[in-house]
Amino acid sequence: MNQVIAEPMSTKNILFLTNTLRKKFNLYDCTYFPIVEFIETVLPEIDPKFSYLYVDKAEMPDTYAYFDNETKVMVIREDVYEGALNGSGRDRFTLAHELGHYVLHSSGVQLCRSDGGRVVTYCDPEWQANTFASKLLMPDHLIYTLTPSEISKEFGASYQAAEIALYKAKKAKLAT
């Protein structure tokens, strides 16, 4: 089975990147990251090669969104876009995940295929993009003292994503 492998990246490094991004755009202490506005407005300004495209669900019935790192085009299903605009935690996470692929895997980072064996977690581009999405939408420094319900409401995340983010943030804090 072919598997895609990315350059190694730890949770700590990904958190550093998401916090740096938030600081650069004066969003460090913002609880509700404006993911749609960031993709539609900020990315095209900072990278003229980046573009996005909304497609009908019938065109991509089994895919919510994807980022093509060769063309730098993010393709998003219209229902996912509308869900993100309306605050759906799952859809906001999907867009943040694709932003993660853009940030982590489009600027000279080589993805390669492997012919077997298990890919270690920190080299898995999907794990990296999920971690990026979680840390971008629910940064550790803002969620430590909250409950999953509070995180879900204040940060626009699903309850399940909030539970996982809080568990990992507390675990990381204990490790330091």
Model-derived features: where do they sit?
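Active-site hotspot residues in diverse enzymes, especially metal/ion-binding acidic/histidine motifs
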Residues: M1-T176
